[in-house]
Every structure is written in structure tokens, then in C-alpha cells.
């Protein structure tokens, strides 16, 4: 093996661990400084490479990131999917490989344009290409915006950008910082370091601004019920009433709370099958001047299934009646859990796809806030909280707090529930609203408007979290503008990059020969 071949192979081998260390930036590890390290390593590995080899380097980096970062998905597929081991491994490998195509596309596009002009690559077109591909990943095939790099910065100084530009703005800042580091070190030019200096100055300035104002006059007491019902028992007919009685007993002990919250699909039956139980619960809550919010599945007369949130007791809707109840219906459904992409092709393959309720119908993208005990609540069911634009569109000037219900029992003791919690924290920070999160097995927690967890209870315990919530007044810039500032920045950056290409200009050029295959 020649020296050149050795170093070429070394780039490929280094790409996998370079991507894998990025997983450590996310919860539960929270080593947020590793994010710019991982991105900078990728950008360095892409220097002076052909388009084809750049795509391969990006793909291997993506295998490292997603192979470690979403390993928790396999827990659900393998434990509850009813698949042969080889089938579950194949499905998981396919998902990881699909997600790795996005870093592969980044690598290829990175060296497709502006080759020989590293400043353009690292500071203009590169960060925007990364951002655009993140948006595509969050949309294609219903979207999978998990492990956007900005999420791992919830505890870093860059977090102060979230109320202005959202998690995508934090990701952009990370790629710009990483690009500046590579440009300054590899090409021995200190001027790009002005970019991270300016970004950190912006984060400091943003941190001094109070975008929203807490309103203690609207404080409310909440009780979040964590039932800790084993997933393998949850839907057994013999466990229906024991589960309902568990939640009812825990609720009865907390009637002094303004709002009592049960997890996603806490009621292990279809709503239409339990009218008497729900009427009695509604009456008890109303008599105690409290509201119960619960997740419940429903099937309409036309056969459509919905994953809903229902409010009972003290609300603006009156006594519970099945035909007149106001519900929130989940819009963003979980692939393979709540609907099967390419169902006609995949359903015969494995029992996982033959679950009777694996084909849910969508609710509307924007729905009225839920009303509970006089408070206006913007809900998101489970996976939906990862879709920042959807959650943002459901927040308005009257919204008091955010609510997310989930059942992360599917993912056992993996890192998945921690990443899910971190995403919920980012939504609270972006929108400047406190957030309550009730789950079956954890993580059940309360988050303030700055994205910090103020109280939580341990996973895998039957428990009740009691906390006082302080709603906020006002709207953050991100709530008002969404991603439009980033759209305009992307357009400006790409336009400027093309203008500079046409002028054949640049602050400095990479005169090194491109490494051949």
C-alpha cells in the first residue's frame, strides 16, 4: 500500500468515529463541545477530495452518527415487533443507511461547488447545504428531524439563539463555527475566526434579552401521572381495568391540582368503548374543580383510527359527551408505528405491520388549543414534538403552556427517551412557554420557558409529579417569524457564493491537488 493509499483509507476509517462522537453531544451525555469537533472533523476530511469520495466520507460519517444515535429504535423493533432477528437487523440497517444518505449528499455537494475556494465552501455554501439537507430530512417520507445537531446545545451558550432562530439556527451556527476552525487551521488564516467571535457575541447579546415575561398571577398546579404500565401488558384485555383503576386511584389523591395529566393512550381501550367510565371521571373532575387531560385512541364510524388527547372536567366544553367532546388529534404519525409507508408492499413481511391500529388517520396540522381549568394549552403527541414548525404554528398569543404526552416504554432503558426529552426542552426554549410532559414510564417532567427541567420523576416508577407552572406573556421572535430569517439567509449566502464564483474571486484558494480515487 502506497503512502497516498494509506492516508486515503485513513480518511474513510476516521469518518465513522468522527460521526459517532456526535452522539455524545445529545442527552443523556450532553458533551455539547463535541458537536463542533465532530463537524470540523468531517469538514477537514472533505478537503481536497473528489465528489465521489466526499460522498463516501459523508456516508460513513452518517453511519457513525445514526448507527449510535438512533440505536434505540432497534429496541422497539426487536422487542415488540414480532420479527425474526435477521429481519429486525435488516430494517434497522436500512433506516441507518437511509439517514446516512443525507451526510453523503452534503459531502458530495460540498465538493461539487466552489472547489478550490475553501472560504466559499466552509463559510458560505457549506453551512447552507447542511441546513437545506436537514430541512429535507425533516420533511421527506413524513420526516425524521431527530439528531439535528442544534438539539445537543440545549445547555450551551448557543442555546440563547433558539428563541430567535430555532434549533435550525443553532445548527447553522455550529457549522459556521466548525468551518471557521477548519479554514483557520488548515489554511493558516486567522480571519475566519472572526465568525465564531461574532456568533458568540450574538449569543451573549441574545442572552441579555427577555423575549417573554413570566406571569405569576396565572400560576397553576399540575399533577403528572406516570403509570409505569409494562408495554407487553398494556393492551391485554385482562389488564384493562387494573390499569384504569391505577390511574383513577392516583388521580383521586391529587384532586387539589388544577390540571391532572395522564400519558399518551393511557386509557387501554377505544374511547367509544368506555362512555360510562369517562362520564364518571368527567363528573368527578368537575366536582373537584379540576381538569383531567388524557391520551386515548378512538375509532370513528367510518373505521378511521385517531390518536387523541381528551380533556375532562373543568373546561369550556361542558359535561362529557362522546359525540360532542373536543379533542386534539395527532397530525404527525409515526412511520411503522401509526401508519405503514408502502403498506401494500410491507404488510405481508412481518407481524409488526399487521397491528390492528397501525394505520391511523391524521388530524389537522393546526388545531385549536385545548382549554383546561381556564388555561390555553398547545399540545403535541409523542413524536410530534420533534417537528418545530408544527408546534410553532399551534402556539398563539393566548397560549399559556405547551403539553406533550408520550409512551416511551417502547424504547426500554435506551437513550431514546432522553433524546426525546431534550427535544421537548428545545420547543419550550424556542417558543418561550413552559412545558409539561407526561409519559407512561418516563421521562415525566416539567420544563420552564428557558428550556430547563425544573422537576422530574425517575423512569420506570409509578409516581405523580406535582409542580407549580408559571405561564408567560409575549411571543419570541421564532414564534412570530419561524424559519423565514434562515430562508432569507440561505438565499443570500448561496447568491453571494455564486456571484463570487463568477468573479473568480476569493480570499484564498486551496492550491493542493485533489486526491484521486
From Swiss-Prot:
Transmembrane spans: 5-25, 26-46, 55-75, 90-110, 128-148, 162-182, 193-213
Residues at the catalytic site: 264, 330, 382
Any one GO molecular-function label of the UniProt entry: N-acyltransferase activity
Pathway the protein takes part in: Protein modification; lipoprotein biosynthesis (N-acyl transfer)
Cellular component annotations (GO), alphabetically ordered: plasma membrane
Keyword Transmembrane appears in the UniProt entry: yes
Membrane topology qualifier: Multi-pass membrane protein
HAMAP family: Lnt (MF_01148)
Protein name: Apolipoprotein N-acyltransferase
Classification of source organism: Bacteria, Pseudomonadati, Pseudomonadota, Gammaproteobacteria, Vibrionales
Gene designation per UniProt: lnt
